From Swiss-Prot:
KW Iron (keyword) present: yes
GO cellular component, one term: cytoplasm
Lipid biosynthesis recorded as keyword: no
Catalytic activity: Fe-coproporphyrin III + 2 H(+) = coproporphyrin III + Fe(2+)
Similarity-based family: Belongs to the ferrochelatase family.
Subcellular location field: Cytoplasm
Annotated metabolic or biological route of this protein: Porphyrin-containing compound metabolism; protoheme biosynthesis
Protein name as catalogued: Coproporphyrin III ferrochelatase
């Protein structure tokens, strides 16, 4: 039986031009082109950091995993929102005769927004898949963060006052209502690293970053808001973007530009440990994650035809809408539910699945 590992990541623009960024942004928005001013802002941010190394780094990570596991598995790489796209790579895997595939998402934590967003592309009548849900507890990865933070404390902070700020990509606040495990996993991850360092609860905190402006509330505190709200600052802030493993715009701009600029304004020393990137400890974590999970059950993924636009029976919409305030449901979902003149309304697939998990919508 031919087996494979499919390593997947979010993706990035194929070229740093206005239209290159526009194409990537449009893919993220599911084919709806953002307004020009939104594209311009993102384009300017990419220009400010000199482009993004994400694809280069990810391909190097893939090559290093392949060097360790290539005798047993064919190793493939795909992006969610840029080339090579997941469906295209699955097509190539089918042509190569692959029958079983371990899916390793290069995001250590499980979230409905991340893992479920990848699963929807896993459609094949030939290949059975095993999706690894999370791997943030891998000892090698925990040691990486603890070791790199310890270096900063020893070599740069020394006896000065400091605070370690663990930050993670934010998610919409209604994730709390749906029981998304991501938030608790971030807190646990931070605590595990802090314990390795012997930090007291006063020496570290958790914040969120990189939220999108799509008209819905996100988990707080945002890292920039946290910094602005402090009445006193330590001598040093150590920023640890723990939900990421590679350098990309949400680290190089959101941390190294925006957080750095605020530290300069407040007269505080800015530090950020290097991202794991291609470090051997990260590769150890990825390889061990495969080893720990490789004997689990593989299964077919045959999503319904209408992945992002599932049909919701109209007689259920009133109850959903009545509870939408408590759920802090996004306006765009309310508008979908409120549509008149049809027997069914369409609801984004992800929202439907989250409603099911929250017990707000009967499972089919």
């Amino acid at each position: 039986m031919k087996k494979a590992i499919l390593m997947m990541t979010f993706g990035s623009p194929e070229e740093i031009t206005f239209e290159g960024v526009a194409d990537f942004f449009t893919n993220i928005r599911r084919g709806v082109r953002p307004q020009d001013h939104e594209i311009q802002t993102l384009y300017d941010n990419y220009v400010r950091i000199g482009g993004t190394p994400l694809q280069k780094i990810t391909r190097q990570e893939v090559a290093l995993v392949e060097a360790r596991l290539g005798n047993e598995y064919s190793v493939y790489f795909a992006n969610k929102f840029s080339s090579p796209f997941i469906p295209d790579v699955i097509g190539q895997m089918e042509a190569d005769g692959i029958e079983q595939c371990i899916c390793l998402i290069l995001e250590p934590h499980y979230s409905f927004y991340s893992v479920m967003g990848y699963e929807k592309f896993l459609e094949s009548k030939q290949i059975q898949f095993l999706v690894i849900k999370d791997w943030y507890q891998e000892e090698a990865l925990l040691n990486y963060w603890a070791d790199e933070i310890a270096k900063i404390l020893k070599e740069e902070v020394k006896q000065d006052s400091f605070k370690v700020i663990f930050s993670a990509h934010s998610v919409p606040i209604f994730a709390l209502d749906f029981g998304d495990p991501y938030i608790d996993q971030i807190f646990e991850n931070s605590k595990l690293v802090a314990e390795k360092l012997g930090l007291s609860s006063e020496q570290y905190t958790n914040t969120w970053q990189s939220e999108s402006d799509i008209g819905i509330p996100w988990i707080k505190p945002d890292v920039l808001e946290y910094l602005r709200e402090q009445t006193e600052h330590p001598d040093h802030y150590i920023f640890v973007p723990i939900s990421f493993i590679s350098e990309h715009i949400e680290v190089l701009f959101d941390n190294d530009v925006e957080c750095y600029d605020l530290c300069q304004e407040f007269g505080v020393n800015y530090h950020r440990p290097p991202m794991p990137n291609t470090d051997s400890r990260l590769i150890d974590a990825l390889v061990n994650t495969v080893r720990v999970n490789e004997n689990q059950e593989f299964k077919e993924f045959l999503p319904e035809e209408e992945t992002f636009d599932e049909l919701v029976p109209s007689d259920e919409t009133k109850n959903i809408l009545a509870e939408s305030e408590d759920l802090q449901m996004p306006e765009f979902v309310k508008k979908l539910i409120e549509k008149k003149g049809r027997e069914n309304v369409k609801m984004p697939y992800l929202i439907k699945k989250m409603l099911e998990k929250a017990g707000k919508l009967p499972k089919e």
